[in-house]
């Protein structure tokens, strides 16, 4: 240990605070907290204790500097540690998924007819609103929304649509919503549905079942059979939900049970969420390179995890976390009620801890098996594509344009087989006029590689969405910048990036393929040439047309490589390519919408660029501006009654053009990176999991730096 570091250790104060350990390059590798900085930090280097823990030996060769921040209390140290971990993202601290990946259900009870909205967990919580969650997967929130909206019949439309709707939507026709937006639904009746939904979401199904049974019997006695049938369906749905939940405790309390399993530097923290004595949810959180003591890891995890979800009455933990009392105070303050951290040694609660530990071990095994399959897929991909190394860091680039207008490029990143959304980028094509995909790709790849050279980091593999022509354009960009695309024989450690092109499957025809089978809607079958099949498809037939496989083009090779269908290697590439396509087309649609918005507003006298941007930010779509009242427009930044009246009069004059057929009726599909969180469009509720993930991806990328 150098003299400067030894001096800092000798001068550490015996006060509460946080410490930041840095490596020899000055990067923060660990953040910790302590009630006494002197005691905690010196314990890592106390040779007299004969400490053989792995992290002690690790620090001796890694640590380059130490920084401490003194706080006024232990509770303040807990809060500061949380912020420092999120800011520096240290290598050896537990790091939960980015909080924008977690989603919650919000119920604004200030509205007379509230609805459930999907929100990001990091959104500032509003007074008067209730939050349920967080949900870490799209499938779980989709199932919950489907259940609640179907059986408790809460409205799904946004407040803006609610205020302006003139006739009920299809949900009213199929008896999924009472249409309070159009009809006079008694507020007390709707409020009862809201209370039922809240009890269901909070896990208090027992109370709900008893009340539903009573109301159903009352409706039947009053000969209100339609109401009784609706209540019966609600009751059956709740009872089916109860059958899926395992009762683990008889006291019907709310508690989370934390399990921890560790092998070497890798560990899994398991959270079993119990509400009213029943197991409601189970989440496994895997972490790598966790060399520090388990009590420190657990303390950091609890502080981060309960930042965006309400802590229950009790949290059962397998060991006492660092500064447990201060941590409990922080969690209680966030919740507004007392939260207890307990470490039971015997009895039913100790048995729950054992269940959580065994679940953590099972999660650990599944996590490592997944890692092994991913490693095999990357190795197989490298072998199939003749790559110099397994592509642990892959990027894919795609172009989206409409007849050469508003051309944009997208770059998505994948590390170790998982999306790396911090490195997603959007590009506006600047130097190419007209429809020239090759030149556009050349520009986008040039800008990407120029930035990579400045940062000193190159991905292992760049995948181009396209065939041989698109690949050659990207290779030319690399050559122009002097970026090697193969390892140097004389200097194997020199950086390089490999490039391939992935061409989509396509309809094919030819003598070798014979004919394509065409299946009619009513089960009839016919044989037709491919040209006839296309005509038949237009007339309502579904054609099973022959398609070529996905093809991978390699530099310097005439024929493409065809990967085995349904293989893990092809799945990795196709998943990366499809994500690049989604990201590009979403950005293109956003720009096209903004252009259409601006072109219409240019005709309004007295509305400058600043007010146009303010309208776009506030309403998001032309249709919303058309439907807005002068009072609503006046609420936009920079608008007064006079400007609001001018905008309203422009859209409601006798010769005003009708709304375009494709004019969006909801919020923009993508918001600028780092922009405010939007409610997920209602249509996403019934969509596939992939579509909901896309709806949640409005903030997944950083803006592309100026080239």
Curated annotation (Swiss-Prot):
The keyword DNA repair applies. GO terms for molecular function: DNA binding; excinuclease ABC activity. SUPFAM superfamilies: C-terminal UvrC-binding domain of UvrB, GIY-YIG endonuclease, RuvA domain 2-like. Residues 14-94 form the GIY-YIG domain. It is found in: Cytoplasm. Its main location: cytoplasm. Residues 206-241 form the UVR domain. Keywords: Cytoplasm, DNA damage, DNA excision, DNA repair, Excision nuclease, SOS response. Pfam families: GIY-YIG, HHH_2, UVR, UvrC_RNaseH, UvrC_RNaseH_dom. Residues 658-684 have a biased composition (Low complexity). GO terms for biological process: nucleotide-excision repair; SOS response. InterPro entries: DisA/LigA_HHH, GIY-YIG_endonuc, GIY-YIG_endonuc_sf, GIY-YIG_UvrC_Cho, Hlx-hairpin-Hlx_DNA-bd_motif, RuvA_2-like, UVR_dom, UVR_dom_sf. GO terms for cellular component: cytoplasm; excinuclease repair complex. Residues 654-684 are annotated as: Disordered. Coiled coil: none annotated. CDD domains: GIY-YIG_UvrC_Cho (cd10434). It comes from the Bacteria. Interacts with UvrB in an incision complex. The UvrABC repair system catalyzes the recognition and processing of DNA lesions. UvrC both incises the 5' and 3' sides of the lesion. The N-terminal half is responsible for the 3' incision and the C-terminal half is responsible for the 5' incision. Belongs to the UvrC family. This is UvrABC system protein C. It comes from Anaeromyxobacter dehalogenans (strain 2CP-C).
């Amino acid at each position: 240990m150098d003299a400067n570091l030894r001096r800092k250790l000798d001068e550490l104060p015996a006060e509460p605070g946080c410490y930041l350990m840095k490596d020899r390059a000055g990067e923060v590798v660990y953040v910790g907290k302590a009630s006494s900085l002197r005691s905690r930090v010196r314990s890592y280097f106390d040779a007299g204790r004969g400490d053989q823990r792995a992290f002690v030996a690790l620090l001796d060769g890694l640590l380059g500097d130490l920084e401490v921040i003194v706080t006024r209390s232990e509770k303040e140290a807990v809060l500061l540690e949380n912020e420092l971990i999120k800011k520096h993202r240290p290598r050896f601290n537990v790091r939960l998924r980015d909080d924008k990946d977690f989603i919650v259900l919000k119920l604004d009870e200030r509205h007379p007819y509230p609805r459930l909205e999907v929100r990001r967990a990091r959104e500032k919580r509003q007074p008067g609103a209730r939050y349920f969650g967080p949900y870490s997967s799209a499938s779980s929130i989709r199932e919950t929304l489907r259940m609640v909206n179907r059986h408790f019949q809460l409205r799904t439309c946004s407040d803006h649509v609610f205020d302006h709707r003139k006739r009920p939507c299809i949900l009213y026709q199929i008896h999924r919503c009472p249409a309070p937006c159009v009809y006079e639904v008694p507020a007390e009746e709707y409020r009862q549905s809201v209370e039922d939904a809240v009890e269901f979401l909070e896990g208090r199904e027992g109370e709900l079942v008893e009340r539903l049974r009573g109301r159903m019997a009352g409706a039947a006695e009053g000969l209100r059979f339609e109401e009784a049938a609706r209540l019966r369906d609600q009751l059956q749905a709740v009872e089916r939900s109860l059958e899926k939940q395992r009762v683990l405790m008889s006291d019907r309390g709310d508690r989370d049970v934390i399990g921890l399993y560790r092998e070497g530097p890798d560990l899994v923290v398991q959270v079993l969420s119990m509400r009213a004595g029943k197991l409601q949810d189970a989440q496994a959180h895997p972490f790598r390179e966790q060399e520090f003591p388990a009590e420190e890891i657990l303390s950091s995890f609890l502080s981060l995890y309960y930042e965006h979800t309400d802590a229950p009455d009790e949290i059962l933990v397998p060991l006492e976390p660092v500064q447990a009392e201060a941590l409990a105070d922080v969690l209680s303050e966030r919740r507004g009620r007392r939260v207890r951290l307990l470490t039971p040694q015997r009895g039913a609660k100790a048995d729950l801890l054992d269940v959580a530990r065994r679940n953590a071990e099972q999660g650990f095994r599944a996590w490592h098996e997944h890692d092994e399959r991913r490693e095999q897929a990357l190795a197989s991909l490298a072998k199939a594509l003749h790559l110099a190394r397994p592509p642990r860091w892959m990027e894919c680039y795609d172009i989206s344009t409409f007849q050469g207008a508003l051309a944009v490029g997208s770059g998505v990143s994948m590390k170790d087989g998982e999306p790396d959304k911090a490195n997603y980028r959007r590009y506006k094509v600047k130097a190419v006029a007209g429809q020239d995909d090759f030149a556009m790709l050349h520009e986008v790849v040039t800008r990407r590689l120029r930035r990579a050279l400045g940062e000193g980091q190159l991905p292992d593999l760049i995948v181009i969405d396209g065939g041989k022509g698109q690949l050659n354009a990207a290779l030319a960009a690399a050559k122009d910048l002097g970026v090697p695309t193969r390892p140097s024989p004389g200097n194997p450690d020199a950086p390089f990036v490999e490039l391939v092109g992935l061409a989509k499957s396509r309809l094919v025809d030819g003598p070798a393929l014979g004919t394509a089978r065409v299946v009619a809607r009513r089960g009839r079958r016919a044989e037709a040439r491919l040209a006839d099949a296309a005509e038949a498809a237009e007339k309502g037939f579904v054609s099973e047309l022959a398609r070529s496989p996905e093809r991978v083009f390699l530099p310097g090779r005439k024929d493409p490589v065809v990967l085995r269908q349904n293989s893990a290697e092809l799945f990795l590439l196709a998943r990366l390519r499809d994500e690049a396509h989604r990201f590009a087309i979403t950005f293109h649609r956003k720009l096209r919408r903004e252009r259409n918005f601006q072109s219409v507003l240019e005709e309004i006298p007295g509305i400058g660029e600043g007010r146009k941007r303010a309208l776009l930010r506030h309403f998001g779509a032309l249709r919303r501006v058309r439907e807005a009242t002068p009072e609503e427009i006046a609420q936009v930044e920079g608008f007064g009654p006079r400007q609001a009246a001018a905008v309203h009069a422009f859209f409601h004059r006798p010769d005003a053009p009708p709304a375009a057929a494709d004019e969006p009726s909801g919020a923009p599909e993508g918001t600028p990176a780092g922009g405010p969180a939007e409610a997920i469009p209602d249509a996403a509720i019934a969509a596939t999991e992939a579509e909901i993930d896309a709806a949640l991806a409005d903030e997944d990328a950083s803006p592309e730096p100026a080239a």
